[in-house]
């Protein structure tokens, strides 16, 4: 079995191979472009993955008709058309609608933030690339193929949470410093323009 080289103190169990479909339910969004509204339920597609924010909305009626399953807090959205394999964890309790260019993962037996980070790791990305239709333009992965991607995980939920929390804090720290960097970069450019 697999075992990471670096571990948090107190965790010694082997990691095991699992397929994504064994630890999460996988769905895709609507296949037709909806009729947009000025307000309503936020509608996400591949270009919104970084922020999970959009200026596109659909009506409550369209949402009720088209979405039996929709993203909820703790779920993961993954790009599957064009940019394949970028993920983000849903952190809002508001209703969200999404396009077919995104896959919705509802973690069942795994911590969301742990899974989000595992999905960005080389092993998962390699498995994703092997199942991506590279000849398609734009490239894409079929929804059914996503669940077949193998990766290594700890089955210890406490270890998953500890790893997930650690990477979540690290992501927030990186974002904080990126904002500071951009602020100083903007300040520098203003000084140069004088």
PLM regions with names:
Residues 32-50:
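Short beta-strand/loop turn elements enriched in aromatics
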Residues 31, 95-102, 134-159:
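A short glycine-rich beta-alpha junction/loop motif
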Residues 7-30:
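Non-catalytic DNA-recognition/assembly elements of restriction-modification systems
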Residues 45-47, 56, 61-125, 137:
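A short beta-sheet element
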Residues 8, 15-17, 149-153, 167-173, ...:
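Long, compositionally biased tandem-repeat segments
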Residues 1-13, 179-194:
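Short amphipathic coiled-coil heptad-repeat segments
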Residues 4, 161-173, 177-178:
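Extracellular/lumenal glycan-associated surfaces
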